[in-house]
Each structure stands twice: as structure tokens, then as C-alpha cells.
């Protein structure tokens, strides 16, 4: 899962970029950066609107694996490149995720400030179904 404030970068902006994708940069937390490093080309990621909305709004696909973040002067952190895959027909709110006991283990709930986090396959299926894609 990748998190962004929608007033900074939203699923609608991601959609407009199209198939060329964008660089997902600016991650300055080591745990989040390590999660970026684990991603493989073709991996799907939920796109979460943080702070404003607090909801999963869509899905993006990794098109380029971890490389040195061009915005990091010290070259310690990495970025990836993602492209828009699909928008959820119904956004999945943090409130609804918290209500589902099968999702209580997610980093989204346990480590709410983490900007990049894994989602296991079972949880992915539950959330995907909630979004009625």
C-alpha cells in the first residue's frame, strides 16, 4: 500500500498520468523505504488517500523497482515508478477497514504513520471485494 495526501498527489492525478507512470519519491522512513525495496515489477499496490479522506481509492502497478530517489541529496533512500491500474468503484474508508476484524493486523491500523506498507493476499482480497472493483 502506498499512501499520499490527496491534495499533494491523488488517484485522479495518477490516472491522468496514464501508462507512463510517475516516480514515487520522497519516502524518508527506513521501514517504508525497505518496503519499497521489496517491491517487484508488476506488483499491485493499493493507493491510499491519507489525512484528507483516509481511504483506499485505487490500485497502481509497480513498473520500475527501487532506485536511488532523485530528491534525496544523500542518496540513502529509494523511489519506485508506478502507473495507474484501476480506481475502486467504492472507496474503502479507514473506518470500514477498522470494523473488519480480519484486517486488524494491517500496518495501516497498527503503524498508521507508515507511508509504504505490505498487504497480505488474504487482506488484499477482502479490501478488493469491499471496493467492488
Spans of model-derived segments:
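Mixed-charge, low-complexity intrinsically disordered regions
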Residues: 1-5, 65-66, 105, 114, ...
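Compositionally biased, charged N-terminal/linker segments
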Residues: 1-39, 123, 131-133
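A cross-family signal for N-terminal binding/gating loops and helix N-caps
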Residues: 4-11, 55-58, 116
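Short, charged, solvent-exposed linker or helix-capping segments at domain edges/interfaces
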Residues: 13, 91-97, 128-130
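A contiguous binding-surface segment within folded domains or other stable secondary-structure elements
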Residues: 37-39, 55, 60
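Short, charged beta-turn/beta-strand-edge "cap" motif at the junction between a beta-strand
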Residues: 48-54
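Aromatic- and Lys/Arg-enriched surface recognition patch
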Residues: 58-117
Amino acid at each position: 500500500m502506498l499512501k499520499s495526501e490527496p491534495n499533494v498527489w491523488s488517484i485522479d492525478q495518477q490516472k491522468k498520468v496514464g501508462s507512463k507512470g510517475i516516480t514515487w519519491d520522497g519516502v524518508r522512513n527506513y521501514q517504508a523505504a525497505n518496503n519499497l525495496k521489496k517491491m517487484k515489477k508488476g506488483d499491485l499496490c493499493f493507493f491510499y488517500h491519507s489525512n484528507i479522506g483516509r481511504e483506499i481509492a485505487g490500485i497502481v502497478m509497480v513498473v520500475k523497482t527501487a532506485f536511488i530517489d532523485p530528491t534525496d541529496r544523500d542518496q540513502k533512500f529509494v523511489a519506485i515508478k508506478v502507473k495507474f491500474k484501476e480506481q475502486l468503484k467504492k472507496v474503502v474508508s479507514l473506518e470500514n477497514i477498522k470494523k473488519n476484524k480480519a484486517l486488524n493486523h494491517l500496518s495501516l491500523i497498527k503503524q498508521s504513520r507508515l507511508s509504504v506498507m505490505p498487504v497480505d493476499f488474504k487482506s488484499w482480497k477482502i479490501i478488493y471485494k469491499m471496493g467492488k472493483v
